[in-house]
Regions:
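Helicase motor core with emphasis on the C-terminal RecA-like subdomain
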Residues: 1-18, 22-41, 45-48, 53-316
């Protein structure tokens, strides 16, 4: 039976207003769907608020539980056990997810703890998590597999209410995606009422992606599912840089540096720029090439990829 969460949802809206924001309709739809026990897939443009759409539902659920406990004088002021597992395929961006969610937790005045567990996590932090997991844990598919292999995994994950798979398109159809699906299958066997939500901005096969994330072949283990479509009307201006001489193009070695001057011109004509490359080695080559061409940019531009030291990535 569906329940109302008037006080909890009002607090979410008030927090948005206090920050000068207004919640999107798709965010409200995801909150409501989660509170009704549903799972699904959020398809919305990059930067449109998918993280808050997926993370605030569990917070509202806990707020409502405390409201009910308050009527009997049993309000719990301690951080709850693990309730949300947030799986991200990109370790380099996991820290940003933690900061975004922790800001919401702090702004709402909740005792929740938000933690991070990736290959960068220190041994001291791992030891703390072994004693008690945070209320919300951001991790990777590989770290999830290690967690599930532990002798006490089922007991430690018994309080889990929600699994969020961020950037689902990055995992769909590859080995890491299969690893994630296997982990989700085990978690659902342990808790058939577990809710699962995927987030993506660039899916073309939405229904297939939903089926892989929340299979409907076993009704006993599959809750009500839905696709929530959010902001998609972003205006994109595309400009193509073409080499002046296309007879010969360096497909090996310093791929693309023949366009260095043209890229520099594009950067100088913009307020802020992200330069993406296909692989990490090309990122290193481009960073070096830009600095050699513009030494005065030292300290103004940064290199970022998953193989860099975690402190360097945080600084960038």
């Amino acid at each position: 039976m569906k329940r109302d969460f008037p006080q909890a949802l009002h607090r979410l809206e008030s927090w948005f207003a206090a920050n000068g924001w207004q919640a999107f309709d798709f965010q409200r739809e995801v909150w409501r769907a989660y509170l009704d026990g549903e799972s699904g897939l959020v398809h919305s443009a990059t930067g449109s608020g998918k993280t808050l759409a997926a993370s605030l539902g569990p917070l509202a659920e806990w707020i409502e539980e405390q409201e009910q406990l308050g009527e009997s004088g049993k309000v719990d002021t301690k951080a709850p056990a693990l309730r949300v597992l947030w799986i991200t395929p990109m370790r380099a961006l996991a820290a940003d997810t933690v900061l975004s969610i922790d800001r919401a937790v702090t702004g709402l005045g909740l005792p929740w703890t938000v933690g991070l567990r990736t290959g960068d996590t220190s041994s001291a932090e791992r030891a703390r998590q072994a004693r008690k997991l945070p209320s919300l844990l951001v991790t990777t598919p590989e770290s999830l597999s290690l967690m599930l292999s532990g002798a006490e995994a089922r007991e430690k994950l018994s309080s889990l209410r929600l699994v969020v798979v961020d950037e689902w398109h990055e995992l769909l159809g590859n080995k890491r995606g299969v690893m994630t699906e296997l982990g989700l299958a085990r978690l659902r066997r342990w808790n058939p009422k577990l809710r699962t939500w995927g987030l993506s901005a660039t899916l073309g096969n939405i229904q297939e992606a939903l089926e892989r994330l929340v299979p409907g072949s076993d009704p006993a283990l599959s809750p009500v599912r839905r696709v929530v479509k959010g902001v998609s009307d972003k205006k994109v201006l595309m400009d193509t840089l073409i080499p002046p001489d296309v007879d010969k193009f360096p497909w090996a070695g310093h791929l693309g540096l023949v366009m260095l001057d043209h890229v520099i011109e594009a950067i100088e004509g913009s307020r802020s720029t992200l330069v993406f490359t296909n692989v990490r080695s090309q990122a290193e080559i481009w960073y070096q090439g830009l600095l050699e061409a513009r030494p005065e940019w030292a300290g103004l531009i940064g290199l970022h990829h998953g193989s860099l030291d975690s402190d360097v990535r945080k600084w960038v």
